[in-house]
Amino acid sequence: MIRSMARSFASAMGCDFAEMDVTLPEKRESAPLFGVDDVVFFGVPTYIGRVPNLIRPFFVSIKGGGALGIPVVTYGNRAYDDALVELRDIMEENGFKTVAAAAFPAEHSFSTTLAGGRPNEKDLQLAKDFARKIAEIITNNPHSICGDHTPVAVPGNPAPYSYYKAVISDNKSIDIRKVKPMTDPEKCTKCGLCALLCPMGSINISDPSITNGICIKCGACIKKCPRGAKSITDPDYLEHKRLLEEEYGNVIKKAELFYTT
């Protein structure tokens, strides 16, 4: 998604582009520095209505240096709540000038039903069109964009931002922060793929049944395991997932795009 935006923007502007995937821990060991000649598409997933809090300190360490910025969030077909306004504020507070923003539905980390298959071809085309429009705005209005600056207006509550509260039947709140995937020993071949994919570096590569650190429920180990050896069996988690799928599984959400001018 972000790659498509950056490539389309660069093509429209006739400039180079580079990408930085900070999903894995080793990619977050040092933060990039940007400057006034840069335009940065900054994408993050929505976690319980917010920017992922465990990776937030890294995002805050990225300095814009006057670069133009485009905050983009994905969300799993429920809502992005305060994630987009929070990301915009992080960028503004760290030297970016936000000129556009977007929120796109994407397959939920818990499920293949919630926004399954998203982003799809239509989403990717919209992302490209979004980037080209930003290029057009910058080209046609360089002084208004680069001069006096007003942050792009987006939905959401101002800081302090709100977390979404997971619930089950009878609207009972649950806490699934300590829930971790289980490993089926009859299916697991100890290939180590799950450990290599874990964004927190929490899975023991020698024994993938051991999760030493925090699990953020990104679903990578579950969805990418070639043997289907990983799953979450916690009853509250499964009930919450079922309710989400019941309420939002057949809903088709549209991307939302925002511009300063």
Where does each model-flagged region fall?
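FMN-binding flavodoxin-like domain, especially the glycine-rich phosphate-binding loop
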Residues: M1-E26, S30-S173, T233-T261
